[in-house]
Amino acid sequence: MNGKRIKVLVVDDSLLFREVIARGIETDPSIEVVARAADPFDARDKILQFEPDVMTCDVEMPKMNGIEFIRRLLPQHPLPVIVISTVSEAVFDAMNAGAVDFVTKPEVQSSKSVEKFLLDIISKIKIAANAKISRSNTADTVNSSAGKINTNKIIAIGASTGGTEAIYKLLKALPAEMPGILIVQHIPPVFSNMFAQRLNNQTLLNVKEARTGDWLESGKVLIAPGDRHMKIKKIGDRIRIETFEGEKVNGHCPSVDVLFESVAREAGSSAIGIMLTGMGYDGARGLLAMRRRGARTIGQDEQSSIVYGMPKVAFDIGAVEKQTSLENIPQVLLAMLK
């Protein structure tokens, strides 16, 4: 934001929450709350009047819910939106509508819960201020009869901000006959299981949240739990999954680096690594380790990334063999599997 304060519009039908959010985020000197709104219609007027850089928006509101509001708003007023929600699958609908990120609503009675919420939303506002607004162009579903696929590989994917929607678009474009896929998405606990169930229902692949003792098999996708690292262990010709609690790595648990480094070590040239949109540098070092051990590697390009952070660092250090748009990644991946 070039040293200027980030202008934020806070939208929530609860006066109490509007005040908690507005006062809390303004404790950060780089953020200025330019307006508050009680409903989407009020918010639309405030957007025109104040031209905010970022909007925070409750999912559950009267007159029009936050998801419908985002769906209608963004084509006319492209604006980074962070949705605030109780623990519910609605956050993924909001991301699909074009929101950049989400934060879980705190218990107002718990000062610890509110404090954690404010730290989280301040961090996400700063990321959102530099984010690109996604247009909902999805990758085309790939014809599953488009040639023989080598399923004796392992695919490892890492993502952060903007990643839930990017992963959905990527997996939706893949046929059922695929090698086993491992995913680390920076996501809170509980939501990781919801995310896995949603992908399982919306794609041709068998998707679940990973558990220690799971075996990676073709057609199966395992997503790291929101508060546990994930790594693999090769036992004979099979791949066993381990998830475990641990210190944050690069500020994250689960960490993409933890997965990628174990894949480099255990699978070597039998793997393909994919780095998708996200803030920071988690996974760059691990992707480089994979490439050095003979793995093929793909990075999402700047144009199609909501936040070109993790893929940029990976590209800059030489970890990315092929950089391309999100829409083109399925084709590149399938070509590598021929």
PLM regions: where:
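Conserved acid/base catalytic micro-environments in cytosolic active-site loops
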Residues: 2-9, 15-30, 36, 41-56, ...
